[in-house]
Amino acid sequence: MSDQTATTSTPFPAPAKPAPAAARTKLILEGPIFSTLLRLSAPNVLNLLAFAGMVTFDGFFLGRLGSDALAGASLVFPWVMLVLQSTNSGMGAGVSSAVARAIGAGKSERANALVFHAFLLALALGAIFAGLMLLGGPTLFRLMGGQDDMLDAALAYAYVALGGAAAICLLNFMGNAVRGTGNMALPAGVLVACVLAHIAISPILIFGFGPLPPLGAAGAAWGLVLPFAVGGAWFVWYLHSGRALVRLTFRGMAPRWELFADILKVGVPGLVNTAFTNLSVVVLTGISARMGRDIAIGYAMGARLEYIMQPLAFGFGTAILAMVGTNWGARQYARARAIAVIGVTTVATVCGSIGIIVAIFPALWLGLFSDDPDVFRVGGLYLHIVAPFYLCFGMGLGLFFVSQGLGRGTAAAAANGVRLGVNVVGGLIAVYWLDLGMTGFFASVAVGFAVYAALLAWAVARVKEPGIAVAATA
């Protein structure tokens, strides 16, 4: 049964009466695992296409402004992705996990209260992101190697994109509340609408049109913030209207630490995990920027593909999270473990296949952004060395969602912290001590992916029934 109907009066899908909770929950608890995983993941393919479009088109348009604009935006891009991912697959997944476990346990009133607390957290986290970037942006981007026109472009992009972080947080938190009910289609549709709007208006804002002046790099940022603000407002209306399986209500609600904690116990490790992922790119971008602008651009364009691997994993991962979380909450532990194995294998296979293709044919990806031979040389070397290890990256990402569904995200954050250390320390040693140059630098990234997958596999395998944390997280 569909949870939404089309309308011509709003750019987003208009909600209809929801399907009974029992039908979707029964499918998650009793349906064939692989076909149910594919059924729940299918709408999230739209998420992949949306994020892929955003990542690709932003780089394409900014590249037309020149190398300084592209390099400046590349300094900011990991921070924008930090906000997007930490509120979607990080902190937002804490919302989804808590809601899924409440529904699995038959506690609908608790699920509704969790949505209210997620709303408060979205506003608070958005304000924190904006404040930190507005105050510390200039110093941060100088430390990352930004200077002159490159620094100006970075600041123009960052002040708008991260100043409007609350819009991103609200859309992702409320969307994850809906995903926690097992409804993947509606959040995917809203996100696609936002990204299509972003792609449509960004070139107009970047280059100008008619009476609209060109805004340069800041135009791409406005093209992100405005659609996400509209999408976030729509989700608030939808959840408040009572048309979803959970409801956002303010009447009679008061903040309760116990409910914040239920979200944060998964969300904070998820946020830290996402922070480690993006900090790795930030630091490696900074190291590469000090080796030269062309090296920085080449590395950034190669590493940008990893930002497509993550929403690809998210497409399957949100379904894995909902299925594992609901079955774990219903005390169907053996089924939850079987879902984990099948889900992780699927994500690793898909990511690994893409990695092999771009490792053999790097121009398929790099040609979208630049025709500079130096950029091709650096980016091609990166993909030759690192892309085959996307299988390990996919395995780690799949296990990350499993750990969140189990309500235990600390192990994933710890494993990603180790990966960050391997990337950064290994990269510095390779470049400045062993004098291995770019080859050693990129090899440290590949080794980091392998270590990440191995540690998470070990940690998740040690989760005990009924819901005892992995020993490493205790």
What spans do the regions from the language model cover?
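Small-residue-rich hydrophobic transmembrane alpha-helices
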Residues: 70-131, 168-182, 186-187, 298-362, ...
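Helix-terminus/linker motif at the lipid-water interface of multi-pass membrane proteins
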Residues: 45, 49-71, 141-148, 204-215, ...
